[in-house]
C-alpha cells in the first residue's frame, strides 16, 4: 500500500493500525452546513470520493467518510 496518494491536489496519508483499521486520511478546512454541523471541505470530499473509487477499481473494499475538525478518511474494509 502506498504511504501517500495525491488526488485532486490533496495528499492522503496511509495509516495502518492493524488488519481491521487501515485507512487514508487528509485534513482540510472546516465548513458548516445550514444546521451548523461540521462538514468536510467540498474539494477534499470530492477527492476522498475519487480515492474511494480508485481503491475499489484496484480491488479493495473502501468507504469514504468524514469526522470532525476537517478530517476525511477512506477506510479499507
PLM regions: where:
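Acidic, low-complexity, intrinsically disordered interaction modules
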Residues: 15-72
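Short, extreme N-terminal segment that most often corresponds to the first beta-strand
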Residues: 1-21
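Short intrinsically disordered terminal tails
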Residues: 1-3, 71, 75-77
Amino acid at each position: 500500500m502506498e504511504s501517500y496518494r495525491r488526488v485532486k491536489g490533496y495528499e492522503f496519508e496511509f495509516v495502518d493500525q492493524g488488519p481491521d483499521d487501515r485507512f487514508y486520511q487528509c485534513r482540510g478546512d472546516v465548513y458548516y452546513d445550514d444546521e451548523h454541523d461540521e462538514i468536510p471541505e467540498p474539494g477534499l470530499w470530492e477527492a476522498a470520493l475519487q480515492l474511494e473509487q480508485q481503491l475499489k477499481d484496484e480491488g479493495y473494499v473502501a468507504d469514504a467518510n468524514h469526522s470532525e475538525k476537517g478530517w476525511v478518511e477512506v477506510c479499507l474494509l
